[in-house]
Amino acid sequence: FNVEETQYTKIVLGKVDATDADFGQNANLTYFIQPSSQDLPFEISPWSGVFSVNGELDREKEDKYVLTVVARDNGHEKKLSSSVSVEVLVIDVNDNSPQFFKYDDLIQWTHSETHDLSNNNFNSAMMIPLYKATIQENAPIGTTVTRVYANDSDFIGNGNGLILYSLPQRKNQHTLFSIDSKEGLITTTGRLDYENQ
């Protein structure tokens, strides 16, 4: 079974079905998960074999469950059983934000002109990491200023954990810095003048 990570309340994933060639009680089957554990977010109907998820699935904690489901007949003298492995793959959803690290400080950032930013995926006030760097005003264009670092605990294989960096810029403002979208390396793209800024 494949199922997305989230919180579930008795959602049916499918059915485990077994047959028995005997008759009467000897052919009536009871299903159960072995070993039975209260910690697992799965359950099976003992009579129908309907397999459900009931609880939280978090791919960052557990990406796959392999369970043993037993089908046992209800014979009076001797109960016979058979088992099958059930694999549940937890599919990643984009539920974690990228987190910066190796920064120098945390500051509260408030911007009254949020609507003027061309890349305005920001709240008007937030705590943001601050990277500090110094550079000479006569540094040539293309000089490395600093590097920023971030990670995302989502699965990178489907793109949810892939991080791309960008620098928000004011509309119609001369750009002095750029960032490598993959590496987080910030470089100069214009001439810096200490007297102007």
Name these PLM-found stretches.
Residues 1-197:
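Extracellular cadherin-type adhesion modules in metazoan precursor proteins
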